[in-house]
């Protein structure tokens, strides 16, 4: 069985939890009737063992076994740090 582990990039929208954060993944979906592409956002809870990611960072995450009721993704790396203004 060759299951491919899903890996996606997204933006951190919340890091208020200990060893966890929330990532927003944006995708474009075609409207079934009118054909216009609409932006849809999915929020995922991600495990971050070392509390590396902060709000605004772009991160790469991958799917893993369920770690809690809502967490089944883990941090791979921080792709881009947020610019602090």
Curated annotation (Swiss-Prot):
Q: Which family does it belong to?
A: Belongs to the universal ribosomal protein uS17 family.
> What is the scientific name of the source organism?
Haemophilus influenzae (strain ATCC 51907 / DSM 11121 / KW20 / Rd)
Q: What does this protein do?
A: One of the primary rRNA binding proteins, it binds specifically to the 5'-end of 16S ribosomal RNA.
One Gene Ontology biological process: translation
How it assembles, according to the record, is: Part of the 30S ribosomal subunit.
Query: Has UniProt tagged this entry with the keyword Oxidoreductase?
Result: no
Q: Which InterPro entries match?
A: NA-bd_OB-fold, Ribosomal_uS17, Ribosomal_uS17_bact/chlr, Ribosomal_uS17_CS
GO cellular component terms given for this protein? cytosolic small ribosomal subunit
HAMAP family assigned to the protein according to its UniProt record, in alphabetical order: Ribosomal_uS17_B
What is the name of the protein in this document? Small ribosomal subunit protein uS17
Query: Which PANTHER family does UniProt cross-reference here?
Result: 40S RIBOSOMAL PROTEIN S11 FAMILY MEMBER, SMALL RIBOSOMAL SUBUNIT PROTEIN US17M
Q: Which cysteine-cysteine pairs are annotated as disulfide bonds in the entry?
A: none
Q: Does the keyword Ribosomal protein apply?
A: yes
State the UniProt keywords alphabetically: Ribonucleoprotein, Ribosomal protein, RNA-binding, rRNA-binding
* GO molecular function per UniProt: rRNA binding; structural constituent of ribosome
């Amino acid at each position: 069985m060759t299951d491919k582990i899903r890996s996606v990039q997204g933006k951190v929208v919340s890091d208020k939890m200990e060893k966890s954060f929330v990532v927003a993944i944006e995708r474009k979906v075609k409207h079934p009737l009118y054909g216009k592409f609409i932006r849809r956002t999915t929020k995922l809870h991600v495990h971050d063992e070392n509390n590396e990611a902060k709000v605004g960072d772009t991160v790469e995450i991958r799917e893993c076994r369920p770690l809690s009721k809502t967490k089944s993704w883990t941090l791979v790396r921080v792709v881009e740090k947020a610019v602090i203004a």
